[in-house]
């Protein structure tokens, strides 16, 4: 585990995802030695640099105890990097997790449930991020709708944490880095 102020230096290769076809983003998988220095096996927000350009992002769990990172087109262009290149990273876990972006459908549901909204407003940013992650990780629209309803009911009852899901993907094998496009 690392202290919030410790800078993690490493290198990783930029990969093009196999799906969706024609994706504008790339990704990289952190070396395990770098991931092990992070404070958690699940999502963790960091600041730092990629190829010398500033970055603020949330690393995603790769389901193997490590992490992966999306590199959006704007950062690719600013850094002058492309798929296949190895880039230097300098990452520092943030001292306080940023507020997550609430999906529109969840936002509407919370607005319609004052008791759920009251609990939502009282929980930490990490807890809100976990609820959002649980809701959006459903593969089907029907599952997502059920999870929104369940989340609102649980929040309204005072439940502060989404439970019963593996935040790292290591045990459930439900999370993974994208599959790289074949060369």
Question: What would you call each of these model-derived segments?
Answer:
Residues 90-122, 130-133, 141-152, 156-183:
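Surface-exposed, charge/polar-rich loops and edge strands
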């Amino acid at each position: 585990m690392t202290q919030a102020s410790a800078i993690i230096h490493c290198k990783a290769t930029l990969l093009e995802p196999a799906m969706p076809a024609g994706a504008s983003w790339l990704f990289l998988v952190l070396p395990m030695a770098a991931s092990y220095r992070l404070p958690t096996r699940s999502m963790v927000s960091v600041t730092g640099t990629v190829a010398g350009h500033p970055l603020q992002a949330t690393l995603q769990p790769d389901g193997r105890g490590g992490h992966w990172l999306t590199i959006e087109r704007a950062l690719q262009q600013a850094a002058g990097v492309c798929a296949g290149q190895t880039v230097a990273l300098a990452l520092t876990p943030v001292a306080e997790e940023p507020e997550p972006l609430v999906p529109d459908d969840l936002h509407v549901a919370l607005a319609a449930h004052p008791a759920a909204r009251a609990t939502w407003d009282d929980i930490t940013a990490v807890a809100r991020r976990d609820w959002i992650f649980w809701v959006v990780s459903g593969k089907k629209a029907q599952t997502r709708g059920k999870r929104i309803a369940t989340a609102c009911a649980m929040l309204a009852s005072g439940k502060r944490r989404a439970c019963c899901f593996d935040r790292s993907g290591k045990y459930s094998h439900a999370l993974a880095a994208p599959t790289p496009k074949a060369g």
